[in-house]
């Protein structure tokens, strides 16, 4: 699995931590914002585009509260973005919504919780079935 990760200035420290965490677990990470100072819209767009272009399987965008990255991610065709701040939501959005992008707020979650959220998101597989109707509806919106 390849994960694209990026952050604005407020999320940069958490992004660096999570990038190293994922690499330590053997996951290939594509850092779309290697330099600090990229704004929220640009950073979230870069990770969304990595999934759209099939450079990455999933994406993680980090800003101060997660809401901005969520709004940007949701504007991209083929992206199902979920703003999460707990492990259960990260698991369920993968299982029920086939989310291919997470938006995380560095001002909301700490490093350990963010690690747990990524673990839950990555480990969970999309269930399909009755949830496919919703996913199809989401994919037709843009």
Swiss-Prot record:
Pathway: Carbohydrate metabolism; D-galactose 6-phosphate degradation; D-tagatose 6-phosphate from D-galactose 6-phosphate: step 1/1. InterPro entries: LacA, RpiB_LacA_LacB, RpiB_LacA_LacB_sf. Its EC number is 5.3.1.26. GO terms for biological process: D-allose catabolic process; galactose catabolic process; lactose catabolic process via tagatose-6-phosphate; pentose-phosphate shunt, non-oxidative branch. It catalyses: aldehydo-D-galactose 6-phosphate = keto-D-tagatose 6-phosphate. Keywords: Isomerase, Lactose metabolism. One of its GO terms (molecular function) is ribose-5-phosphate isomerase activity. It comes from the Bacteria. It holds the Pfam family LacAB_rpiB. Belongs to the LacAB/RpiB family. HAMAP family: LacA. Heteromultimeric protein consisting of LacA and LacB. This is Galactose-6-phosphate isomerase subunit LacA.
């Amino acid at each position: 699995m390849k994960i694209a990760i990026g952050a604005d200035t407020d999320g940069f420290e958490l992004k660096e931590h999570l990038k190293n965490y994922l690499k330590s677990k053997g996951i290939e990470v594509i850092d779309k914002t290697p330099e600090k100072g990229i704004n929220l819209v640009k950073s979230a767009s870069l990770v969304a585009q990595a999934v759209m272009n099939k450079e990455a399987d999933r994406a993680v965008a980090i800003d101060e509260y997660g809401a901005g990255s969520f709004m940007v991610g949701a504007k991209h065709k083929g992206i199902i973005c979920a703003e999460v701040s707990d492990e259960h939501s990260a698991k369920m959005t993968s299982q029920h919504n086939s989310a291919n992008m997470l938006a995380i707020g560095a001002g909301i979650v700490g490093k350990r919780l963010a690690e747990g959220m990524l673990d839950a998101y990555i480990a969970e597989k999309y269930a399909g079935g009755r949830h496919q109707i919703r996913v199809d509806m989401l994919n037709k919106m843009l």
